[in-house]
Amino acid sequence: MKETHRFLIPDYFPQFACKMGACRAACCEGWPVSVSMADYFSLLGLDCAPALRARLDCGIHVVDNPTKEAYARFEPRYDGNCPMRLPDGRCALHAELGEDVLPHVCRLYPRGVRAEDGRFECSCANSCEAVLEMFLDRAEPITFLERELELKLPPLPQRRSVFETLGLAQKIRLHLIAIVQNRRLPLPQRLICLGGLMDRLDCALKNRDKALLEQILAEDPSELCPKLAEPEVGAEHLQFGLQIIEQMMEILDEGSQSIRDCGKAALAYFHGGKSGDIARYEAANAHFSAVFPQWETFFEHMLVNHMFFAQFPFQDRPESMHEEFVALCAVYAILRFLALGCMADRRDAEGLIDDMAAAFRLVDHTEFDRYASRLLKRLGCASSQEICDLIAL
């Protein structure tokens, strides 16, 4: 049954539409699709053609430790696609029986619905190429507005991790987004500002100091940042950052089907010289900046959309504010590394979109935020200067 609520949404949301069969890569490509117990038994009872029944019976399996929310899943085929995907790109379930029979996740994704304290939000994940295509040539910052929406909502899970926010979680999140949208500074410096602000917010929240918290949130982001951002970035810093992200990508590439192709392409480019080859980095950076002069605005939109979709820094996982900040820096570094390495001898916008969407399939469909800061620490990238080196790329 459809419900009507007032949602906070990004301004692009009303224009979003799934490309269906026209999608070059499905937003679930390379990953299993988890469905609830209710959806699983609903699929078992469908009255459908024998060919679709065979697809369902072979494609969906109960997981080893099922729960009501994650009871079974569609395992990807050898080519990374969902077993329900037809040769023309459409979903076999949707094509034969319509939208209403789809599991909740398939019907909504890449849309994500969030509800806390009576507030509803809805946005789209960056793992969808149609979302990123709206961002590539967009000049104006993403804004957020309230809109009444009628949606058939899934059962919304209870939070496993509860953070002290003094009732200001949404206001904190939007203030952090405003820091990333401060175009008076280059994007890496905005991230440095973000880290400094998050340290102050963390202190206020731990001390339950609501007056200090409200004072911080009342500050103008464009006035705050110049006081915080004074990074030291020379050739040796760039070389260190490049070496760290190369090592990180080698590890991620081994375990991620979604970024394997673009990860290998980027690593092959940078490994054409010695590890941390600044000359190859500078050549790729110059080429990328010339082909996509608006790249920084595009990256801003991707980070902002990711932060809103994931409820940064209050994702439902037991991570500290600092670890969430480091994870966001890791996301930025991965995007830059893939963009520069994969596009070093290319000029096609579709290729850039596909590589960025693949990166977000890794970020959105895994516990990336939980292991990113630990992985960087293991690789020797933990101090404030080392994080600055990482995002200077």
What is each PLM-predicted segment?
Residues Q15-A22, P141, L238, V304-M307:
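Short, compositionally biased low-complexity segments
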Residues R184-L393:
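Hydrophobic, aromatic-lined core segments that form the binding pocket/scaffold
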Residues G21, W31, R85, H94, ...:
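Structured loops at beta-to-helix junctions and adjacent beta-edge loops in soluble globular domains
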Residues A26, G30-G59:
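Low-complexity, highly charged intrinsically disordered N-terminal segments
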Residues E3-C23, I60-P103, F120-C122:
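Immediate flanking context of iron-sulfur cluster ligation sites
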Residues M1, R6, P14, M37-A38, ...:
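Flexible, acidic/Gly-rich N-terminal and inter-domain linker regions that tether
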Residues G89, L97-G196:
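Internal, well-ordered alpha/beta segment that forms a basic, Gly-enriched binding/recognition surface
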